[in-house]
């Protein structure tokens, strides 16, 4: 079971196979983010265990917009993360996520919520992984960016575990739904 001091959810048996697309649904405060944090190892399970294959490579997109150095620009952040890429390659990666040169050179803490979310998503989508865990990735995004994200996730060959309140975002491509509401007594 997962939680902080007391269980938020009962014991759960969840197996995510390679390439499967899952969505976790439930009302605010039910434990969706706590479940994700337990799955990635940020929180220990209160009871039971989380088993991961050695080949598992997780990319986690948190709904919180925090940065190691909020005064750093997106371009500097990407340069730190990908030191072998040229400035031109980094600008191209950012441009693919609709992050203009002007936005890419501003301090991260001066960007709007939507702009920061685009930087975080762009960073997450560059990482090599076989499981994407996304906590409310559509929050702060305009419709164009949501559409582009949806298309990118549909093309992603690895497994996805998504927390999202927008059924129209995942309705046509997610294969499995875990409704936490049905688990709570």
Provide a role label for each language-model segment:
Residues 1-185:
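ABC ATP-binding cassette signature C-motif
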């Amino acid at each position: 079971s997962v939680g902080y001091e007391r269980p938020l959810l009962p014991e759960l048996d969840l197996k995510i196979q390679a390439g499967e697309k899952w969505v976790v649904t439930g009302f605010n405060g039910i434990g969706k983010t706590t479940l994700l944090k337990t799955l990635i190892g940020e929180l220990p399970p209160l009871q039971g265990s989380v088993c991961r294959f050695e080949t598992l490579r997780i990319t986690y997109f948190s709904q919180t917009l925090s940065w190691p150095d909020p005064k750093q620009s997106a371009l500097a952040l990407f340069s730190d993360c990908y030191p072998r890429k040229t400035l031109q390659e980094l600008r191209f990666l950012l441009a693919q996520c609709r992050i203009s040169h002007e936005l890419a050179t501003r301090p991260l803490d001066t960007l709007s919520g939507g702009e920061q979310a685009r930087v975080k998503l762009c960073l997450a989508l560059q990482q090599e992984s076989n499981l994407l865990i996304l906590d409310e990735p559509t929050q702060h995004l305009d419709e164009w960016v949501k559409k582009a994200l949806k298309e990118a996730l549909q093309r992603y060959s690895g497994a996805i575990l998504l927390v999202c309140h927008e059924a129209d975002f995942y309705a046509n491509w997610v294969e499995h739904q875990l409704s936490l509401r049905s688990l709570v007594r």
